[in-house]
């Protein structure tokens, strides 16, 4: 049946040949459907007499007979059901039962439920039908005619305005390493808001929290942490949080990094004879600055910035003096979209999109088939695990000094890096992913503890000049991965200069030259993969967290940081397969701010003084005195600071055992906390004095051991 539009009428014609052909022509697309004659059990060269008689009788009659039905303008405006009834009545007396079944099949295929199926199979059906018709039928099949669909248009987005919802709605995020993200339904409403609407939204959520208590909060978070470990079979018995021996302070390692900020190399300096040289007395002034103690009255902007649908919360507080609900200013950096996976926009980054498709092919993707009856699969040290093989391949080629052990990317072992060289471009690992048979619940996944959301973190603002920062409310051992830095993966050539303050460089042409040489050597027999790696090596990519990112975007700068970034791959070796995680360089005590070193150019970039206020601060009042110390004395400074935090932590634990060990703890964090009484505060001062006297002997013994 053919439909053509001429003037104000529509004409339908139905061919009455033995091979009925039904054609639908429209302005947008054209679809041809045909029915092949059924094959006879006899070969195609010897049809039965009945078949030959049928063919001859058909040929004697007019094979190309057609029934023409003309429908007026009024009838063409009728409903589709009425038009079909008109056609069926007209051809019912002229078609055989076989042709009627063909018409009925046309109506079924023309329904909305089958449209997509027809379009997806038309190509394969055309080729198979043409081959079958040429071998077993005297009537050749007619080719299917289709028009190409119009190119899909995407919205134009700005890097300075919220666009996370647009990218997700248009299915533009092609990050291959994304994992399931369970959010509260309100996240969709929030993502569609403008900046001003988000600011008003948080203003309505603000509350004044009175009688806040950091000691009680520390106890509750510790109880919730232990419950998570106990109830999770993949953690219970596999992961243990502990305060290690004295080497856990990482004093010497921290001294090497501190000297690097002074522009000095620890390994190239000659040994000094200290004689009577001692640690400067000014170091004692920095003890109180190690731990941030929140005030009793706080303004809570929100109890959960990332609108999670589980028990994990990331609250936001402002503790600036003199602020009220009416005077609180919510800056634009707080109006971001919280994400737990990097974003790759296939429209803006066509090179990355092409690399993702090549790396994700069945022959190039790296994922293991390891499985076990135990909750945690032992992929690490498994020579048959392709993910561990890739991890071992990268570890064996990481740059480090011969005297230090190479960093291991084990799930439950600390990421202890003893080399004084920068870790970022010299060390990279490989981890199992949720697409593996082990689902990432194995010993070869350094991001597993981050995905479990073990360690509680809060966002706070104590000084408007510094802005918002993050602090831990739990004790975190050295070498623990705690945060993944997420953002939108952007080519450095397109990154606006004003966005550099909220971006972190993921790859570098010069810094990753050694890495790309290794990967090209590995895939030299795979020309397609080799070419895309060669092209990627000419670009440097950034993680832009201006409008979408994770809680890691709030980590402030410090000249003596307690965290450092580290990179690892999943599934493949493109920048889109790379993840950036922050791990602790030293033991983190409850209340301690989590910081990074932004680099030597940070002060020049910001055009202002550094406000980290550490003893090694480049803008600090005692910078000259501490910068002239040698590495061993600086290491002793870090030991003293660690012991000061350790004494305070021990006192707090005894307070918790005395006053808070009995009582119900909520599953999620709830404000306000119960405050201390005057008696409790007096007892704490007495306990602190006694504990300090008792622990000073331990400190002197440990210091003497280190000097020896």
From Swiss-Prot:
Keywords: Chromosome, Methyltransferase, Nucleus, S-adenosyl-L-methionine, Transferase
InterPro entries with a match to the protein in the record: Class_V-like_SAM-MTase, SET_dom, SET_dom_sf
EC number: 2.1.1.-, 2.1.1.366
Reactions catalysed: N(6)-methyl-L-lysyl(9)-[histone H3] + S-adenosyl-L-methionine = N(6),N(6)-dimethyl-L-lysyl(9)-[histone H3] + S-adenosyl-L-homocysteine + H(+); N(6),N(6)-dimethyl-L-lysyl(9)-[histone H3] + S-adenosyl-L-methionine = N(6),N(6),N(6)-trimethyl-L-lysyl(9)-[histone H3] + S-adenosyl-L-homocysteine + H(+)
Alphabetical list of SUPFAM superfamilies matching this protein: SET domain
Localization in the cell: Nucleus; Chromosome
Residues reported in the UniProt entry to bind S-adenosyl-L-methionine: 598
One GO term of the biological process aspect: methylation
This protein's GO CC annotations: chromatin; nucleus
Tissue: Broadly expressed in the nervous system, including head, body and tail neurons.
Principal cellular location given in the protein's record: nucleus
Transferase listed as a keyword: yes
Single GO term (MF): histone H3K9me2 methyltransferase activity
Superkingdom classification of source: Eukaryota
Compositionally biased spans, kind Low complexity: 54-63, 126-136
Keyword S-adenosyl-L-methionine in annotation: yes
Null mutant phenotype: RNAi-mediated knockdown prevents age-related decline in the expression of bas-1, a serotonin (5-HT) and dopamine synthesizing enzyme (DOPA decarboxylase). RNAi-mediated knockdown improves behavioral performance in pharyngeal pumping in aged worms.
Residue segments, region Disordered: 36-63, 101-152
Subunit structure, as described in the record: Interacts with baz-2.
Role: Histone methyltransferase that specifically di- and trimethylates 'Lys-9' of histone H3 (H3K9me2 and H3K9me3, respectively); involved in positively modulating the rate of age-related behavioral deterioration. May repress the expression of mitochondrial function-related genes by occupying their promoter regions, working in concert with probable chromatin reader protein, baz-2. Involved in modulation of the mitochondrial unfolded protein response (UPR). Regulates level of expression of bas-1, a serotonin (5-HT) and dopamine synthesizing enzyme (DOPA decarboxylase).
Family: Belongs to the class V-like SAM-binding methyltransferase superfamily.
Protein name, per record: Histone-lysine N-methyltransferase set-6
Species this protein is from: Caenorhabditis elegans
Lineage of the organism: Eukaryota, Metazoa, Ecdysozoa, Nematoda, Chromadorea
């Amino acid at each position: 049946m053919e439909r053509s539009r001429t003037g104000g009428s529509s004409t339908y014609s139905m061919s009455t040949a033995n091979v009925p052909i039904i054609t639908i022509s429209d302005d947008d697309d054209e679809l041809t459907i045909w029915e092949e004659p059924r094959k006879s059990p006899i070969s195609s060269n010897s049809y039965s007499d009945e078949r030959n008689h049928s063919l001859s009788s058909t040929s004697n009659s007019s094979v190309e007979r057609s029934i023409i039905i003309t429908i007026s303008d009024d009838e063409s405006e009728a409903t589709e059901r009425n038009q079909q009834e008109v056609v069926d009545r007209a051809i019912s007396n002229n078609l055989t039962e076989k042709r009627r079944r063909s018409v009925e099949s046309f109506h079924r295929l023309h329904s909305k439920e089958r449209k997509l199926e027809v379009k997806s199979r038309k190509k394969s059906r055309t080729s198979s039908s043409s081959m079958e018709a040429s071998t077993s039928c005297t009537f050749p099949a007619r080719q299917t005619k289709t028009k190409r669909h119009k190119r899909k248009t995407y919205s134009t987005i700005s890097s300075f305005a919220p666009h996370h919802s647009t990218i997700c709605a248009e299915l533009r995020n092609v990050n291959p390493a994304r994992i399931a993200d369970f959010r509260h339904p309100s996240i969709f409403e929030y993502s569609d808001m403008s900046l001003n609407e988000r600011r008003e939204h948080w203003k309505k959520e603000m509350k004044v929290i009175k009688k806040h208590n950091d000691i009680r909060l520390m106890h509750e978070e510790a109880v919730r942490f232990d419950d998570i470990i106990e109830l999770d079979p993949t953690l219970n018995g596999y992961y243990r949080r502990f305060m290690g021996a004295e080497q856990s302070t990482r004093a010497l390692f921290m001294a090497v990094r501190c000297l690097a900020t002074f522009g000095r190399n620890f390994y190239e300096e000659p040994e000094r004879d200290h004689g009577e040289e001692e640690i400067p007395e000014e170091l004692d002034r920095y003890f109180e600055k190690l731990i941030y103690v929140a005030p009793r009255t706080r303004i809570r902007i929100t109890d959960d910035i990332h609108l999670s649908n589980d028990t994990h919360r990331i609250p936001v507080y402002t503790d600036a003096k003199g602020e009220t609900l009416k005077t609180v200013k919510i800056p634009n950096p707080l109006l971001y979209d919280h994400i737990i996976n990097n974003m790759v926009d296939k429209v803006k980054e066509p090179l990355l999109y092409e690399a993702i498709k090549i790396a994700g092919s069945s022959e190039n993707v790296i994922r293991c088939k390891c499985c076990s009856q135990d909750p945690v699969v032992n992929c690490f040290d498994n020579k048959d695990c392709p993910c561990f093989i890739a991890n071992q391949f990268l570890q064996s080629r990481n740059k480090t000094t011969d005297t230090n052990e190479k960093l291991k990317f084990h799930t439950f072992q600390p990421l202890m890096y003893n080399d004084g060289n920068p870790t970022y471009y010299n060390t990279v690992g490989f981890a199992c992913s949720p697409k593996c048979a082990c689902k990432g619940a194995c010993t070869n996944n350094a991001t597993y503890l981050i995905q479990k959301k073990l360690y509680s973190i809060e966002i706070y603002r104590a000084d408007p000049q510094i802005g918002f920062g993050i602090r831990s409310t739990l004790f975190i051992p050295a070498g623990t991965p705690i945060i993944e830095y997420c953002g939108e993966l952007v080519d450095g050539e397109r990154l606006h200069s004003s966005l550099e303050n909220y971006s972190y460089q993921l790859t570098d042409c010069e810094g990753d030259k050694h890495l790309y040489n290794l990967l090209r050597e590995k895939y030299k027999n795979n020309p397609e993969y080799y070419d895309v790696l060669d092209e990627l090596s000419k670009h440097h990519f950034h993680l832009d967290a201006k409008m979408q990112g994770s809680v890691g975007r709030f980590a402030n700068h410090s000249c003596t940081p307690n965290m450092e970034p580290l990179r690892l791959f999943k599934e493949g070796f493109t920048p889109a397969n790379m993840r950036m995680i922050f791990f602790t360089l030293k033991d983190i005590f409850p209340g301690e701010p989590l910081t990074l070193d932004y680099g030597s150019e940070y002060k020049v970039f910001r055009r202002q003084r550094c406000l980290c206020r550490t003893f090694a601060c480049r803008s600090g009042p005692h910078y000259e005195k501490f910068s002239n110390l040698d590495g061993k004395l600086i290491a002793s400074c870090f030991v003293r600071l660690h012991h000061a935090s350790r004494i305070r932590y021990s006192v707090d634990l005894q307070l918790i055992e005395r006053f808070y060990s009995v009582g119900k703890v909520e599953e999620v964090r709830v404000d306000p906390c119960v405050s201390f009484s005057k008696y409790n505060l007096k007892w704490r001062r007495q306990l602190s004095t006694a504990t300090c006297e008792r622990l000073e002997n331990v400190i002197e013994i440990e210091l003497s051991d280190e000097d020896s």
